[in-house]
Curated annotation (Swiss-Prot):
It is found in: Cytoplasm. This is Elongation factor 2. Pfam families: EFG_C (PF00679), EFG_III (PF14492), EFG_IV (PF03764), GTP_EFTU (PF00009), GTP_EFTU_D2 (PF03144). The gene is EFT1. It catalyses: GTP + H2O = GDP + phosphate + H(+). GTP binds at residues 26-33, 158-161, 213-215.
Length: 842
């Protein structure tokens, strides 16, 4: 137990080589918060008695009631290492004290945006995997997010006590199950190898995998056992570590190591991992759980475990917990793994700088980030807002990448749309206070140097969700975070009492600040819309809105799904529209964009800010575009980043460059609200075939061109066999075999399609993966539990957009009904207008 003072923390912060910023990530219910507890307890914040039950990082009331983590919370830990351990660290360090900033993040799919925010400010990740369930869909999603941010993973295989007590497996089975889990983690990592970081895969024999039980508070790495045996037998620890995993066997008769599983006489030998690592653990479990009073003291003496008087009287699980905690304390194994194998900010920022910084990679700011220099110009990235205890205000939560933040310092607050040299999205204000985040409390601190995580008071009014703080006007922003989920479910919110309206508006502002992935806006019909990533996410957001942010009773509409509008063919004829004054004409055709390219644009692989020649090259090589077309992309839409394109295919048009901005603006308007549902368009490419313009500049201004472009886009769109795309969830369901029938019947009823069904080796569980339209997903969990007597647990994550069958213009079809309902809800005319409305004859 360590008692911190802020001054001690501050002196540690200056030795940046000894700081570790890491997040804990995992699938829901694999035990992140419980594991985090055993770490926090070591740093002296909760007492030993409560660990495993306190879930210290679940700070909110609803988190404690539901037993899930919703927001990510930060905590600082302190750790000291022995001299011979410090020697093994492959990066520069000073002294033996380490400061670990740990962020516990949620595992539930709906909150993966919280995880993204946590990952941006950390350099390493502790990936927790349940040893019975293995690598699940969310483990993969989060791991991918981490690797995309160039974050180094280490793995903990948790809930080993379940395997021992519930499934009663043999040692070899357990070893095989560990090996399989490690392999499936490495498969995900291998698909994301990055040459700058080197090999990121995890290996038990190198000490980058720990095994343990968060609930019982014990864990071990192969390295710890190697240390024990190397002292006992006097062999080299590094050699011992390699022997304790994989196919190496020890023959006790000849005292020799072999890699064959039989000795000379053909008798089977026991694997070294089973013999030296698992055997003592299995023996302890067997002796204690079978109440063998005479064996226990002998074992404890051999393992050098000393119990206090009152602890000797315990039995069963209680005794097991105490003994295992003394034998293999979880914090030791995890802290050792974190300190030895995760990078310090100095190491990590050297290779993360170019993925973090938007500007040129050779300017002084990027160099400051790369060197993590506390004396360079200030660069702070704010990744999210954390509500303070008095509800009204927020702490800005983020990380100093270069320079030093001081209380009272004047900073430039740059929002995500800021461009150097312009005044948009920029405020210059003083930082009121800087604080350290410690789970449920905050500690004031004078200044924070580069490489550390902090909270800032007094700038919350100027930032929406995330942004960059700098002191120099030449500095570019840090890159915006890419969220792996998109808000696809929305509800309309009204107040029950009209006088409360201003409070609702204020509450919505606060809500969109506090959650990185919620959208709030006012629709055309004047409703207040809140959009979230799924049912649970929305439920939590609305609860927050009602209780904290607005504090007034609300009326909430049933949830509605957002759609996308697209085309399935090329326009059947060239669309033409004339401007209001009849002097300008635009000729267009629309055609669909391949799904591959749309995804690449949405994931940011093809980016509007890329160099156009480089982008043309990629589009020609990978997506089969014509190079001349690819070079003449005028813009992406909507919002300048969506998956719709304008391509200029016109030849020798006079004054064309003058109306380019107006055409782009018209296209942004058209793609933001399509003609069918008023939703965003997706995967629509518009080719400008010809433009006729008036000779006088005054007759071809924005007021003439913008509405014309919007109309002609609609006309071309409606001529190209329009279709509606709906969002699809990927559902992963874990269940025993007898529940599979129930799952299929519920999925069939909900238009779901099963894509795979497999049994997890060594367990009675099956994993069913299926696609389920978001529209049908409301109440899915409840129905599924009814059909399977509560044995099936679904996990849903947004996967892709899929075209709906049927003609959206025909009110009799299923799609037509959706269109009709949506148009009624938004107060439009009931029938979709024909193309004639937007098409002008010559």
């Amino acid at each position: 137990m360590v008692n911190f003072t802020v001054d001690q923390m501050r002196s540690l912060m200056d030795k940046v080589t000894n700081v570790r910023n890491m997040s804990v990530i995992a699938h829901v219910d694999h035990g992140k918060s419980t594991l985090t507890d055993s770490l926090v307890q070591r740093a002296g914040i909760i007492s030993a008695a409560k660990a495993g039950e306190a879930r210290f990082t679940d700070t909110r009331k609803d988190e404690q009631e539901r037993g899930i983590t919703i927001k990510s919370t930060a905590i600082s830990l302190y750790s000291e290492m022995g001299d011979d351990d410090v020697k093994e660290i492959k990066q520069k360090t000073e002294g033996n004290s380490f400061l670990i900033n740990l962020i516990d993040s949620p595992g539930h799919v709906d909150f993966s945006s919280e995880v993204t925010a946590a990952l941006r400010v950390t350099d390493g990740a502790l990936v927790v995997v349940d040893c019975v369930e293995g690598v699940c869909v969310q483990t993969e999603t989060v791991l991918r997010q981490a690797l995309g941010e160039r974050i180094k993973p280490v793995v903990v295989i948790n809930k080993v006590d379940r395997a021992l007590l519930e499934l009663q497996v043999t040692k070899e089975d357990l070893y095989q199950s560990f090996a399989r889990t490690v392999e499936s983690v490495n498969v995900v990592i291998a698909t994301y190898t990055d040459k700058t970081i080197g090999d990121n895969q995890v290996y038990p024999e190198q000490g980058t995998v720990a095994f343990g039980s968060g609930l019982h508070g014990w864990a071990f790495t192969v390295r710890q056992f190697a240390t024990r045996y190397s002292k006992k037998f006097g062999v080299d620890r590094i050699k011992m570590m390699e022997r304790l995993w994989g196919d190496s066997y020890f023959n006790p008769k000849t005292k020799k190591w072999t890699n064959k599983d039989k000795d000379a006489a053909g008798k089977p030998l026991e694997r070294a991992f089973n013999m030296f690592v698992l055997d003592p653990i299995f023996r302890l479990f067997a002796a204690i759980m079978n109440f063998k009073k005479d064996e226990i003291p002998v074992l404890l003496e051999k393992l050098e475990i000393n119990l206090k008087r009152e602890e000797k009287e315990l039995e069963g699980k209680a005794l097991l917990k105490v003994v295992m905690r003394k034998f293999l304390p979880a914090a030791d194994a995890l802290l050792e793994m974190i300190v030895l194998h995760l990078p310090s900010p100095v190491t990590a920022q050297a290779y993360r700088a170019e993925t973090l910084y938007e500007g040129p990679s050779d300017d002084q700011f990027c160099i400051g980030i790369r060197e993590c220099d506390p004396k360079a110009e200030l660069m702070v990235y704010i990744s999210k807002m954390v509500p303070t205890s008095d509800k009204g205000r927020f702490y800005a939560f983020g990380r100093v990448f270069s320079g030093t933040v001081k209380s009272g310092q004047k900073v430039r607050i740059q929002g995500p749309n800021y461009v150097p040299g312009k005044k948009e999205d920029l405020f210059i204000k003083a930082v009121q206070r800087t604080v350290l985040m410690m789970g449920r409390t905050v500690e004031p601190i004078d200044d924070v140097p580069a490489g550390n995580i902090l909270g800032i008071v007094g700038i919350d009014q100027f930032l929406l969700k995330s942004g960059t703080l700098t002191t120099n006007e030449a500095a570019h922003n840090m890159k915006v975070m890419k969220f792996s989920v998109s808000p696809v479910v929305q509800v309309a919110v009204e107040v029950k009492n009209a006088n409360d309206l201003p409070k609702l508006v204020e509450g919505l502002k606060r809500l969109s600040k506090s959650d990185p992935c919620v959208l709030t806006y006012i629709s055309e019909s004047g409703e207040h819309i809140v959009a979230g990533t799924g049912e649970l996410h929305l439920e939590i957001c609305l609860q927050d809105l009602q209780d904290d942010h607005a504090g007034v009773p609300l009326k909430i509409s049933p949830p509605v799904v957002t759609y996308r509008e697209t085309v399935t063919n090329e326009s059947s004829m060239t669309a033409l529209s004339k401007s209001q004054n009849k002097h300008n004409r635009i000729y267009l055709k629309a055609q669909p964009i391949d799904e591959e390219l749309s995804l690449a644009i949405e994931e940011g692989k093809v980016h509007p800010r890329d160099d156009f020649k480089a982008r043309a090259r990629i589009m020609a090589d990978e997506y089969g575009w014509d190079v001349t077309d690819a070079r003449k992309i005028w813009c992406f839409g909507p919002d300048g980043t969506g998956a719709n394109l304008v391509v200029d295919q016109s030849k020798a048009v006079q004054y064309l460059h003058e109306i380019k901005d107006s055409v782009v603006a018209g296209f942004q308007l058209a793609t933001k609200e399509g003609p069918i549902l008023g939703e965003n368009m997706r995967s629509v490419r518009v080719n400008i075939l010809d433009v006729t313009l008036h000779a006088d500049a005054i007759h071809r201004g924005g007021g003439q061109v913008i509405p014309t472009m919007k109309r002609v886009t609609y006309a071309a769109f409606l001529l190209a066999e329009p279709a509606i795309q709906e969002p699809i969830f990927l559902v992963e369901i874990q269940c025993p075999e007898n529940a599979i029938g129930g799952i299929y019947s519920v999925l069939n009823k909900k238009r779901g399609q099963v894509i795979s069904e497999e049994q997890r080796p060594g367990t009675p569980l099956f994993t069913v993966k299926a696609y389920l339209p978001v529209n049908e997903s409301f109440g899915f969990t409840g129905e599924l539990r009814q059909a399977t007597a509560g044995q099936a647990f679904p996990q849903m994550v947004f996967d892709h957009w899929a075209n709906m069958n049927g003609n959206p213009l025909d009110p009799a079809s299923k799609v037509g009904e959706i269109v009709l309902a949506a148009r009624k809800r938004q107060g439009m005319k009931e029938n979709v207008p024909g193309y004639e409305e937007y098409y002008d004859k010559l």
